[in-house]
Amino acid sequence: MTLKFVKKQNEVGDVWSFFFEPLEPVDFVAGQYLNLTMPGVPPAVSDRLFTIASAPHEPLLQFTTIIGPSHFKQKLNSLKTGQEVEADQLGGDFTWEAVPSALSNDGVKRLFIAGGIGITPYLSIIRYLIHKQQPINATLLYAGKNEKRPFVEELHTAVEIDPTLIIKEYSETRLTLEQLKKDVPNVEHYIVYLAGSQAFSEALGEGLIEDGFPRQQIKYDYFDGYVDLEY
């Protein structure tokens, strides 16, 4: 599919959002990803997976990322309005709807854990549920330095709209397994979603599993290329 670049906006620090108009309808589920192919970039590094930050009902596709020195990121950051990029490989089960078959989707508790830019799939899900006027019924643990955590104000507004969304923020202290279990003492009753750098997500996920948490109740969305959180 072809996407036409519309605009970019700074979210916080070196975190930017890029907005594209799809030239054909994109039928996706909140929390899924697309692969973008950047023109003018060597083939070996011209592709990258991005979680879609926008919700399915929104007219533009939003991708949010940290702008670094890579050839791909620099090309993305230099796109002009009207330029086109190709997208494919729509997929992913890091979604509200995808829960283990042994659990009922009605009334299931969800624990969203985000490290920095890993907030994007949750943003898509939260926007979608608010649009549908469907209770979120989730706890979000959001970790990372303030200059690495976009959309904080929007998330606070979401809590005002729907108090069934509970947010705990970790900007000064590291979110460890011990802190997680302290802040969510009945974590074994949740489906746990983990999104962020591989090191961040695996440290918490594997720690839970070692404590006896069912592996099938953990969902991962790794953000390749990002180092562990900075505090």
Kindly give the residue locations of the regions a language model identified.
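FNR/FR-type flavoprotein reductase catalytic core
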Residues: 68-231
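Ferredoxin-reductase
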Residues: 2-84, 88, 144-146
